[in-house]
């Protein structure tokens, strides 16, 4: 099967660093992971032949860890340590930086107005979301009750969509997370942190939406 006919989410999991390539082209492989590469490229008016060629090069590299075949309990433990704990560190620091940048550079036209508010909203939503996963959904899956978790999983997927929408607002507010020439050190550091957060959150959502949840619902 050609890459263009495969879902973005599957490609992001099977090809090393494909997720970084999709991020470069602003293609949503987490919440929009079920759309094929061809459809995603068409929506962005991108040349699918060029992207396929880049994926073919990436596919030659060895994959570090194939989570599609890992035990569900191992995936859950990885998600908590690698993503949940990391987001809990990232967002408070980014909110502090955004507060400072918006205050100090309030008179500059390029200041990302509203960024503190949007990061705070994301922090509050994710804090509640991750707590529900850790206290309710993940224990159900670990106990082999994933096939009975359609309700909680549908809620989590809906909340993933909401987080994805907030990321789009944040990208719009920050000129696609690109610092202006006059940006100070804090401003640049904050944008580096936001880019890292976006990468982490998209990988996090993709692993749940495209691997953990479907396998849990299938009764593993």
Curated annotation (Swiss-Prot):
Listed GO MF terms: metal ion binding
Gene3D superfamilies: nmb1532 protein domain like (1.20.120.520)
Top-level division of the source organism's lineage: Bacteria
GO annotations of cellular component type: cytoplasm
Entries under PANTHER family matching the protein: IRON-SULFUR CLUSTER REPAIR PROTEIN YTFE (PTHR36438:SF1)
Family to which this protein belongs: Belongs to the RIC family. YtfE subfamily.
Name of the protein in question: Iron-sulfur cluster repair protein YtfE
Gene encoding the protein: ytfE
